[in-house]
Curated annotation (Swiss-Prot):
Main location: nucleus
Domain of life according to the entry: Eukaryota
Basic and acidic residues bias locations: 15-36, 116-129
Quaternary context: Interacts with LMO2, possibly leading to regulate the transcriptional activity of a DNA-binding complex containing LMO2. Interacts with OMP.
Protein's name in the database: Protein BEX2
Region (Disordered): 1-38, 108-129
Classification via InterPro entries: BEX, TF_A-like/BEX
Molecular function terms from GO: metal ion binding; molecular function inhibitor activity; RNA polymerase II-specific DNA-binding transcription factor binding; signaling receptor binding
Positions of post-translational Omega-N-methylarginine modification: R51
Organism per entry: Rattus norvegicus (Rat)
Length: 129
């Protein structure tokens, strides 16, 4: 079982390295996609070229992409493990949503109800005969 987990981790590391190499190869292409440089007159006979920001390349979101990849890749040997992880992730999300819903309902019901909060010994303070 551990060998399968270790193998899955190695495969993920290899995929991440491969994606990083692809990103490095894509950077020169992104640099070519920039807007054309406009030369502005600086002084007589000289031109000033604005440099602008260099962070114009596309920013990737690896975490969201990894989750999508995790959910949709089932045909591989590690597919069953990933499917179990997705099911566990779904169960955790359902539990969190139920807890959140219960807390929201308890707060809203407390605000709507006119009854005072009941204690174990509330009869001691009752003024009714």
């Amino acid at each position: 079982m551990e060998s399968k987990v270790e193998q899955g981790v190695k495969n993920l590391n290899m995929e991440n390295d491969h994606q990083e190499k692809e990103e490095k190869e894509e950077k020169p292409q992104d640099a070519n996609k920039r807007e054309p440089v406009v030369a502005l007159p600086f002084e007589a006979g000289e031109y000033y070229v604005p440099r602008g920001s260099r962070r114009r390349f596309r920013v990737r979101q690896p975490i969201a992409h990894y989750r999508w990849d995790l959910m949709h890749r089932v045909g591989e040997p590690q597919g069953r493990m990933r499917e179990e992880n997705v099911q566990r992730f779904g169960e955790d999300m359902r539990q969190l949503m139920e807890k959140l819903r219960e807390r929201q309902l308890s707060h809203s019901l407390r605000a709507v109800s006119t009854d005072p909060p009941h204690h174990d010994h509330h009869d001691e303070f009752c003024l009714m005969p």
